[in-house]
């Protein structure tokens, strides 16, 4: 029975492109895997805390020597890591905020990366080895070659490096750009770019989920 872990990060509970695209994927995935289960983690509604010294140091301290602060920190970290370890497939739906990923996603990454457990050397033995990973990355503008903000995209490189370090090789990235065009008059001329990008993204997600 396949288990899909879906990690959501958009602050917007309504009108979010990344959430809407994720729903498209989940619907198609459930249809293709009627016996499958979906574990859902909403980083906006329940933001993980930034990794602190007590939690970090607990990983290198015998459990019987943990302070109350370390014990409390480890509890949530174990929950997050456990969800990742139990998954056969990972879906990340991530908007771009200020040219990078949401800070809640960075906090989640810091919590689940644990050297010697989720991150091994070589990476081919890490937690995502053998898992399918699908990334939905939405961007309000466009940051490709030849655009005014070419080189400003710190979202996709970060995601790619994190997934590689965790051993992921079966990765499909679905990027939808110019998501602000329908709501920002200054970008209205690019609405067609958004619509084409979104349509292509939805098609790719349905195909990926059904595969």
From Swiss-Prot:
A single GO molecular-function term is: FMN binding
Task: Print the keywords alphabetically.
Answer: Flavoprotein, FMN, NAD, Oxidoreductase
Subunit structure and binding partners: Homodimer.
PANTHER family from the UniProt entry: FMN-DEPENDENT NADH-AZOREDUCTASE 1, FMN-DEPENDENT NADH:QUINONE OXIDOREDUCTASE
Q: What does this protein do?
A: Quinone reductase that provides resistance to thiol-specific stress caused by electrophilic quinones.
Task: Name the chain's protein.
Answer: FMN-dependent NADH:quinone oxidoreductase
The catalysed reaction is:
2 a quinone + NADH + H(+) = 2 a 1,4-benzosemiquinone + NAD(+); N,N-dimethyl-1,4-phenylenediamine + anthranilate + 2 NAD(+) = 2-(4-dimethylaminophenyl)diazenylbenzoate + 2 NADH + 2 H(+)
Family per record? Belongs to the azoreductase type 1 family.
Record's keyword annotation contains Oxidoreductase:
yes
Mind telling me which Pfam families this protein's record contains? Flavodoxin_2
Q: What class of enzyme is it?
A: oxidoreductase
Q: How is the cofactor bound?
A: Binds 1 FMN per subunit.
Q: Which InterPro entries match?
A: Flavodoxin_fold, Flavoprotein-like_sf, FMN-dep_NADH:Q_OxRdtase_AzoR1, NADH:quinone_OxRdtase_FMN_depd
| Taxonomic lineage from the root | Bacteria, Bacillati, Actinomycetota, Actinomycetes, Frankiales
Q: Could you say which cofactors this protein requires?
A: FMN
- Originating species: Frankia alni (strain DSM 45986 / CECT 9034 / ACN14a)
EC number(s) on file: 1.6.5.-, 1.7.1.17
Q: Where does FMN bind?
A: 10, 16-18, 138-141
